[in-house]
């Protein structure tokens, strides 16, 4: 199945109300390869947030994907055959930040995308490491709940 069809199929299935699903693009008419589906973890409800998510963050994710191809983490010869799904958390308060630095936001999401792909392609963390460390790892928000901070 061509990646464009895979991406389209991923976009139309199981839509969650308010949780936008879009293909990562370099610009309004240039889709990144491998086809990459972005799924927002936040209900998108205002134009500024949408523009930041579907502009700065979307472009950053697309560049992080290409960085993975450029350095060989993803085989260039398989770029048309693979699909990536990225679950995106962008704090809703970003739309109220008048001093938002789009370059910093772009760089953070580009690097995070690249690092996540690199880990995934290298099977990190390994199942052995996870099993060995399971009882030592506490989700930070669970810990905050235990500590009475949320």
Q: Model-predicted segments: where are they?
A:
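Core structural elements
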Residues: 73-93
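Flexible helix-coil linker/hinge segments at domain or subdomain boundaries
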Residues: 44, 48-75, 102-150
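Flexible hinge/switch segments at interdomain interfaces of large molecular machines
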Residues: 13, 17-44, 78-79, 83-85
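A generic structural signal for short, solvent-exposed coil/turn residues
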Residues: 2-4, 29, 74-76
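Short hinge/gating elements
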Residues: 9, 32-52, 90-103
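Single conserved hydrophobic/aromatic residue that forms the stacking wall/gate
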Residues: 1-7, 12
